[in-house]
UniProtKB/Swiss-Prot annotation:
Sites bearing Cysteine methyl ester, chain numbering: C70
Assembly and oligomerization: G proteins are composed of 3 units, alpha, beta and gamma. Interacts with beta-1 and beta-3, but not with beta-2.
Keyword annotations from UniProtKB, A to Z: Cell membrane, Lipoprotein, Membrane, Methylation, Prenylation, Transducer
Membrane recorded as keyword: yes
Record region (Disordered): 54-73
Predominant subcellular localization, coarse grouping: membrane
GO MF term (any one): G-protein beta-subunit binding
Protein name per UniProt: Guanine nucleotide-binding protein G(I)/G(S)/G(O) subunit gamma-11
SUPFAM superfamilies: Transducin (heterotrimeric G protein), gamma chain
Maturation-removed propeptide residues: 71-73
Family of this protein: Belongs to the G protein gamma family.
Entry's localization field: Cell membrane
GO biological process entries: G protein-coupled receptor signaling pathway
Amino acid sequence: MPALHIEDLPEKEKLKMEVEQLRKEVKLQRQQVSKCSEEIKNYIEERSREDPLVKGIPEDKNPFKEKGSCIIS
């Protein structure tokens, strides 16, 4: 299936697509950034105690820890 190039469409088709997109966007539920950012911040802070990227991985449970040294003789 060939790619659709907007610039190749007639003006009427472009306007139809734009109206279609605007109809989809107007149905979206919107929230204030201040409220959403506070919720995201709380979510992150609540889970940071279990986050291995924040608290680290215990040495005994680290799957990437070298098991021993390599000796070439």
